[in-house]
Swiss-Prot record:
Localization annotation: Cytoplasm
The protein's name: ATP phosphoribosyltransferase
Function: Catalyzes the condensation of ATP and 5-phosphoribose 1-diphosphate to form N'-(5'-phosphoribosyl)-ATP (PR-ATP). Has a crucial role in the pathway because the rate of histidine biosynthesis seems to be controlled primarily by regulation of HisG enzymatic activity.
Pathway linked to the protein: Amino-acid biosynthesis; L-histidine biosynthesis; L-histidine from 5-phospho-alpha-D-ribose 1-diphosphate: step 1/9
Length: 299
């Protein structure tokens, strides 16, 4: 059992995932200064230490029990898990929660003028990648033999440099591929950030803090996915109008001053309120429709 009294969380030192992880901690009420190049930062209001490391070091730190929690992309986590499993090493951790940021996809890409008719088009080809295990698993599932070329950066230049016939790399917008004369042809893995915990039991105090953080994360993510909707509805159309607004709980119905024919309706909706829905509400007689963002929510 871990005896250090402060909860240790590993997160990416820099990059988009780092920025989004910092924002999540901030929204969860963790006051911490992550400016500058400090490798370890300390929370001001909670017994939490943040270790800022390379993203591909985070899974190992959690697997080996060096830190208690890690915020990491699923692609990096699973690549390291497959690597250790292939080497016969033990892999132990707890998946606590998938996070709603850090989305990306791992895709196959070829020269823009190459015809692609499925993974079998790459039979016996050289494929450059920074994710050899995820690529190996996918190609094995497809029954396609290939040669893996391991590159730790600038994978997209491999075909033009004559190092590979195709690549397997992370894609966001596809602009980098296009700039290098490549086209995305097959998505082999979709990833988001996730929160993982060491397998070894934590102290009672630490576990209570982890549970508190998880509750706050749930509140933050529910708030991101929800909207607070307020409108005025004719009493004789109330049932039809509320049917258009699926909510977390039943709507709040309030009387309106100086108007006995209408009521105010307040509801927290977990579905996006599109223009089409608002137009349907208007057709049913709803008025003064307001759709507001929610910062925090505990359902």
């Amino acid at each position: 059992m871990s005896t250090n009294k402060r909860l240790r969380i590993a997160m990416q030192k820099k990059g988009r995932l780092s920025d989004e992880s910092q924002e999540l901690l901030k929204q969860c009420g963790v006051k911490i200064n992550l400016q500058g190049q400090k490798l370890i930062a300390y929370a001001e209001n909670l017994p939490i230490d943040i270790l800022r490391v390379r993203d591909d070091d985070i899974p190992g730190l959690v697997f080996d029990g060096v830190v208690d929690l890690g915020i990491i992309g699923e692609n990096v986590l699973e690549e390291e898990e497959l690597t250790r499993t292939a080497a016969g090493d033990k892999v132990e951790y707890k998946m606590l929660r998938r996070l709603e940021f850090g989305g990306c996809r791992l895709s196959l890409a070829v020269d823009s003028d190459v015809e692609f008719d499925g993974p079998e088009s790459l039979s016996d080809c050289r494929i450059a990648t920074s994710y050899p295990q995820l690529l190996k698993r996918y190609m094995a599932e497809q029954g396609v033999p290939f040669k893996s070329i391991l590159l730790n950066g600038s994978v997209e230049v491999a075909p033009r440099a004559g190092l590979a016939d195709a690549i397997c790399d992370l894609v966001s917008s596809g602009a980098t591929l296009e700039a290098n004369g490549l086209k995305e042809v097959e998505v082999i893995y979709r990833s988001k950030a996730c929160l993982i915990q060491r397998k070894e039991p934590l102290s009672e105090e630490k576990q209570a803090l982890v549970d508190k953080i998880l509750t706050r994360i749930q509140g933050v993510q529910q708030a991101d996915e929800s909207k607070y909707i307020m409108l005025h509805a004719p009493k004789d159309k109330l049932e039809e109008i509320t049917a258009l607004l699926p909510g977390v709980e039943n709507p709040t119905i309030l009387p309106l001053a100086h108007d006995d024919t209408k009521v105010a309706v307040h509801v927290v909706s977990q579905e996006n309120l599109f223009w089409e829905t608002m137009e349907q509400l208007k057709e049913k007689g709803a008025s003064s429709v307001l759709v507001l963002p929610i910062e925090k929510m505990l359902a």
